Regions:
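Short glycine-rich or small-residue beta-strand-to-loop segments that form or flank ligand, phosphate
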Residues: 22-25, 91-97, 146-148, 199-202
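Short glycine/serine/threonine-rich phosphate/pyrophosphate-binding segments
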Residues: 33-35, 101-106, 130-131, 150-160, ...
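Anion-binding alpha/beta catalytic cores of soluble intermediary-metabolism enzymes, centered on
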Residues: 50-87
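Glycine-rich phosphate/diphosphate-binding loop of Rossmann-like nucleotide-binding domains
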Residues: 88-131
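Glycine-rich phosphate-binding loop
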Residues: 135-173
Length: 210
């Protein structure tokens, strides 16, 4: 299968054909030249390019070389798209327990949208104020898939899983105090959920959930 060997990176141009989504660029740890060369290579072969965990400095590097780049500061993502817009598929709902979870939740949203999905967002509906979530029960129950993002005790996906028939993708975040262990407590809570139909991704992995 073809790839482009840049020396410091082997860019997989056929991943979109195999998996339905092109290779994604993880920005941290890359020099300006490396990031720009990889991005240029991807743009030449793909109609959509996603760069994750990009800080404003990384965006400035890419924007100077590729002016069509778009930055989502909350999600820390850079997106480049070309060609015709395709109709979006409805049914993805992303819920976040707290405002501090939004960078991870928005990363999931950007990823899902780039994959051709119309995404609805429901923010700050953690279980400490469960009435905030129940106010949107009809929105939850019409979703085809729900991504539930939470730190602290990580209970939101279990609650959502008990309210909907759709699959739930649980995303633990590193938000929380001491004994949250940078998201480990939320991860273990989600893995041990008694609600059926829940899949769990890694801590802070909004991209993996989207």
């Amino acid at each position: 299968l073809p790839f482009e060997d840049l020396g410091f990176a082997k860019v997989d141009h056929h991943r979109d054909l195999r998996t339905g989504f092109p290779e994604v660029i993880y920005a941290p740890g890359k020099s300006p030249d490396q990031l720009i060369q990889i991005t240029r290579s991807m743009v030449e072969s793909s109609s959509r390019v996603l760069i994750t965990r990009a800080d404003p400095e990384a965006y400035a590097w890419v924007k100077e070389a590729l002016p069509e780049a778009h930055y989502n500061e909350l999600a820390r993502t850079i997106v480049l798209k070309r060609g015709k817009e395709v109709p979006l598929v409805r049914g993805v709902l992303i819920v976040a327990a707290g405002t501090a979870d939004l960078p991870v939740a928005e990363e999931a949203a950007v990823t899902a949208e780039l994959m051709g999905n119309e995404v609805e967002r429901l923010w700050d509906v953690g279980i400490a104020g469960v009435h905030r979530l129940l106010e949107h029960l009809s929105l939850l129950q019409k979703a085809k898939v729900v991504v539930a993002v939470a730190g602290m005790e990580g209970a939101l996906p279990s609650l959502v899983g008990g309210l909907v028939s759709a699959p739930v993708i649980a995303v633990p975040t590193s938000v929380g105090y001491g004994a949250s262990f940078q998201g480990l407590a939320a991860l273990l809570a989600m893995l041990n959920s008694c609600s059926p139909g829940i899949a769990v991704v890694n801590i802070d992995n909004g991209f993996g959930a989207g």
